[in-house]
Structure formats: C-alpha cells, structure tokens
Amino acid sequence: MAGVVDTLSTVGRALQGALTGRQSYHLDVPAAPDAAALSVVSFEATERLGEPYRLKAVLTHPLELARENYLRKPATFRVTPADGSVPRLFSGWISQFSRTRTTRDFCAYEMELRPTVALLELTTASRIYQQKTALQIIESILRRHGLEGHQFAFRTRREYPEHKFRLQYQMTDWDFVRLLMEQEGLYSYFVPSRFGTHLGEVFTIADDIDHYIYQPALHVPYRETAGLESGAETVFSLQTHARTVAASFMAADYNPDHAYERLRDEANLAFNDKGNYGQPYVFGTHHLDWKGARWEAQLRHEAALAGQIVYEGESNVLELCPARILRMDAVLPDAPHGQVVTEVIHKGGRDQAYRNTYKAIPSGRRYRLPIDERKWPRIAGTLSGRISAPDRYKYAYLTGEGRYVVRFDFDFDAWRKGGESVPLRLAKPFAGGLKTGFHFPLLDGTEVAIAFHDGNPNRPYIAHALHNSVQPDLITHEGRWPSRNVIRTQRNNKLRMDDWEGHEGIKLSTEYGGKSQLNLGYLVDADSKQRGDGFELRTSGWGAIRAGKGVLISADDQPAASGQQLEMERVRSLLQQALQSSEALAEAARTAQAEAADCARQRALLDDTLDQLKRAGLLATAPAGMALASGADLQLSANENLIATATNHVDVSAIKRFTVAAGERISIFAQRLGIKLFAARGKVEIQAQRDEMRLMADQNITVTSANGRVVIEAKDELLLKCGGSYLRMSATGIEDGTRGERTIRSNGMARQGPASLAQSMNEMSRTAFNDAYVLRNEITGDPLSDHPYEILRDDGSKIVGVTDASGRTSVQKNQDVERIRIRILPKVGKA
C-alpha cells in the first residue's frame, strides 16, 4: 500500500509540474492517500451570517477514487493568492462525493465541503430544555455533537434571560439553533482556528456591532472595470438597494402569571428616518414582563432596519467573509464607517480568476437575522404525555397555581421524577374568579394530550386526559354500561347517571361511612338487578337533615314533578279538619265545665308556622299512614304545647306502665260513651291530695266491693243526704234526720256505752320544690357575691334579697312547679 501511495504522490507532482500556469485552488484530504493528485477545475463557496458555509468543487483525478476515503472525512480547501500571501482556507468535512465522468485519461468528481457545525443538520430531534438561556441551550447542542470548547465561541453583550421551557420538536439540531439565534437577536460566522486546520474553523456566535471583524483593517479601492483587470484587489461593482420599512414595532402578549394586564410595548430605533412608515403589531411573542415586551419590539425593528439598506457588490478581495468590516475609498452616505459583509459567494477555476459577489449593510447597524414568524415551527393538534409526580405520590401533585408536571412521550432524557417539564396549566370546561372552577385531579401516570397556545412549542398546556390499555375507560361495551354517564374518582367516589330506557336512575356514593349513598329513580344492585325504585339515602355513619327555613316531608305524590316545592294543600286540609274536630270537642268540654284544649295555640301553629313553612318548622305527612318505631326509647317533647288529634281513635298501649303527669291539671272529657278505668290486678287509687274530690253522675252511682268491704272514712264529718233526710257522723256523735217516717228493721237492737274506731286516715305526701339559685357574671362566669336581686313569681309577688358569698339566693319553697323570673339589681351607689 505504501508503494501505491508513493506512486500516486509522484504522479500528482508530475501532473502539477506539467500544467501550464499556476494552480491556485487545492483540496487537502489528509485521510485519503490519493488526494494529492486531485486537481480543482472550479469551485463555488457560499457564506452567510447565521448559516454554515457550503463549498462545492469540481475536481479531476487520474484514478477512480474510493468513496470511503473521502465522504465524511476532514478536508481543507485552499485559495492561494497570486502574490503568495496568506491563503484563504475553508476547513471542514466532505459531505457529498459524486463521480460525474470517466474517461481514459481522468475521472471527474464533485465534492461538497461543509464546516463541522453543519453536522447538526443531519440530526433531527425532539428534546426539552428547562431553566436555560439560549446560549446555554446552543452550547449543550454543540457539545452533544462532540464540539469542544475551542471549536465555538460566544461574543455577546446582552444579558440573556433564563427560559423556563423550550421545546425542540422534530427539528434538526441546526434548525433549532438557527431558530434560537433568530428569536434572540444572535448571528453566527466562522473564523480560522488558532489550533490548526485539522480542527476546522471556530463557530462564533455574536449579538452586537462590537463583534464584527474589524482587524486586520480591510480597506480596498473601488474601481469599476472596463473589460480589463489589473490583478489588484478591488471592488469593481457596487449597488445600493434601499426600501421602506416599518417606522416602529409594537409587541404584546398575555402572561397568565401576570393576568391583571396584557404586556405591551413598542420600539422606534430610527426616529429621524422619514422614509419609514407604519407600526406592525405582533401579538404572542411569549415575553413575560414589560422588559420582555420592549425587547421583542426592539428586536423586530432592528431586524427590519438591518434589511433596509443593502449593498451588493463584486470584487476579487479574498479576505471578504461574513461579519468582516469592509471600507472603500468610495463615499457611502449611509455607511460612513464601512460596510459589514453579510453574504459572500466565492468563485474560481482553471479558466476563471478568483472573484466574488457579496452583500453588506452599514456597519453602524446591528445585524439581525431576518424574522419571519410564518416559518417558525408550529405544532398543530396535540402531543401525548404522562402526568408525573415524585416518589409515587398517590394524590394529585400540584403546584401552588394548580399546575401539573408532564413527561412528554417523545422525551427519553434523564430527568428527576416530577421534573420532566415546567408545571403546565390544565384546560378545564369551566374556570373563573372567586374560586369558581371545575377540578378533577390528574394522578401520576395519567395519559394527557398536550396542546400549545397558537401552536407555539414553547407554550404547552394540558388539553385533556385520555384512557389507554393500562388505564382503560370506566365505560365500555360490557353489560348495560353504554347507557351510563359516570364520574368516578380513584377512591370510588361516584356519580352515576343511567339512561337505559325505562330504568333511568342516578347514584351518588362514597366509600366512607360504610358506603354513604343517594340513589334516585330505578335502584339496582351490583349485578344491575332491580332492588327498588324512587329514592334512597343511606349510610352506616351519622345522618343529618337541616333546613334553616323549615322542612316538609311528604308522601303525597306530585306527578311529573309539576307542583310547587311547598305544595301542602292535602296536609293543610287534614290539619284544618283536625283543628275543627279539636274546636268542636273543646266547645263540648267547656259546656260540660271540663278543661278545653288550647285550640288557639293549635291554630297559631298551623297558620303561623306550618302553612307554607312561614317559620322554621317541620311538617311530615303521609296520606296512607305513618309510624315511628324505636328499638329502645321514643321521646316526643315540646317546649310549649304537645298536640295530638285523631278523627277516630287514639290508642295508647304499654306492656308495663303508663304514666301521665301534669304540672297544673289533667282533664279527661268523653262526650258520648263515657269513661272506663279498669285494673285487672292491683289497686285503683284516686287521690285529691290538696283539695276536694267530687263524684257526680246524672243517674245512678254504684260503689261495690265484690269480695271485700266498702270503707268510707272522713276525718271531720261524714254526711249522707238524700231528698232532705240525712245522716251526719262526726267524732262527737251521730245525727240523723228526716221529714218523714223512719223505719228500722232488725232482728234486734242493743244499746251499750260509748265507743269509737281508731282513725287510720292516709297522710298525703307533699311534693316540695325547694331551690336556691346561683347568680353569675355573664362574661367571666364568676359568682356574684353579696349582690342584690329580685324574684318575681307568677302570682305577682316579689322577693328581694342579697346573694351570699357563693352567689346563692335564698331557698325558694314552692308546693308546685312554678315559673319565676330573677332580676339582678344594681348595687347601691353603682350604675
């Protein structure tokens, strides 16, 4: 192999020596052993600010070349000036290799040379960048492609903001870098590496006029040609193109983190230029504050002004390159300090001397890449992702603003769990102020569809959630489920609405409290079999029904739910009938001098409280019957009156005792069929412990002892009267009298000395209500010692006293239950 290489090198040198004239263009490929024999027929190199250059060369070689020795191999193209000065170098790698012609004498080839950074054009990626500036993002991309720190450089003046989120989606790495430069006001160019051509050229990113290439100074004459060339470096053609651009720019956007106002500002960098007109308004520039709005407007105006005046020239100046400052002896009113080159197209060949065409702008203007937002990437539709939470957090992992972290399905980079994206907003069917909204939490692993505001990849939000094979839909084709509308949470809190025809129903349930449920309509069990209809409210925990204005519980039907909420005509009619019955019986009781029912109170209850629930009452009604049952005790209590009315019978039964106690009076009145009091066993005792007892009948009164005695006893006197005749018995004697005859029928009569029976009167027990009351300060609760008070009784009497050291009043002794009022009097000398 070494012999072949030596032979080819010898052939190459011989060919070069045999050529007439000098060879100014060379392509060096160190990895190709036969590259020395390459001869450049022609070349064209295109350089622009913000783009990797592209050099195409047509070459010949006496042999057929192996593709693998050239394609993707480092190479350097040299343009050597005729005066032997420093050559112009293009260092990079061969990106294209084509054999275009083969003859007996040579083979023709076309090759393309690109800089190292052009490798970024070959990699399409989707990647997320967080909490990085644009420069940091660009550096990370360059390093990912193997570029070292000496192969690129940043020369910037502006302080670049840190972006919370940037998305590269289905873009080549170079297109994404180019996009960042356009959006951030950056441009790029290449300079020779001081470490040698084998490392390529240095990719330089800059942002201001200070970073143009000023040294060494390039000052050339402007000389138009007349068909002849002197060979000296000159600019021999120059055109100036000017156009009207916008006089200013306005930029605005909405930032939900500063939702109180839309962020808007404008920029005018050429107040004195009267040739400009208009103010384009750009909305959606994704700035976060007022400073950002001003910068976005300024950037767009700088880009417009950079393209306002463009010079197009032709020259043979080999040093021309993007970002180079070019000065001429011609006067350019708009470029008193020279031009900055933005584009150069180099050409040359065997039959053509080197020359170039170039474009430039006044060097006093900041160069900005042309901004064409129509070409910026837009994501139509949505991307898939998964909700992400750290440490398998079992509830919704939310930020203070209610946002979620999402891992995009295209993203395979290593992120900490719960840090795969910035927190994203969730689009909801309803949202608003005053804490209004609609919220169902998204849990770790939930699939979501991610949309983008205006299609901007840098502005994602969660559009909705979806089911998948791992998290299947809760409603499928199984059974009767297609008719169901269901909301179900991870802990089986559920709202189910079934639209199956004829079996419509609603279920609201939670697992807590042993399945607390509200079931409406057609009630089914777990197997969808009917277990009832109507409604059911149940729980294994506590239950409470509260209504501050009143409660109506009714078993009266309202077909098709057509009536009013407090429809109660039927129950009001029943209560009115009951009231009328009570009033009739009360009138009869009053006629019989019995105690009448308090019908006025009953009417007030109906009219003032129960009717339409004018006050906070409870009304329960059932047309076919009602029952209250308790496994233990049942209590009915009223602070005022307890009223019970029946059109027919009132039946009260007690297996053991039946007690009735009244603080004042018990009145029992039977209008027609009388009263029966029976005791199958045990005594029947009737006592009037503090007053008289009267037994009265319109006809006979019978007192009978079937198997014992009848004892009638009185302490002072026993008096029997009938038709004027009488028998009076007392401790001092017996007296009888009659207006008619007195007949004594007996078998005999005995008269003996005085005698009497011992008195065995029953003593009446007294129920004493002896109470002392403690008066306390209503704020501190401390007893009011030695404090005057006044007690008012129901009979109008007053008792005035002073409390003792413990705040107690004097003992109040009463024979009966009695209401009293206690007034706390002011101490003497105090208000």
Question: Locations of the language-model features?
Answer:
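Amphipathic alpha-helical and helix-coil boundary elements used as assembly
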Residues: 1-831
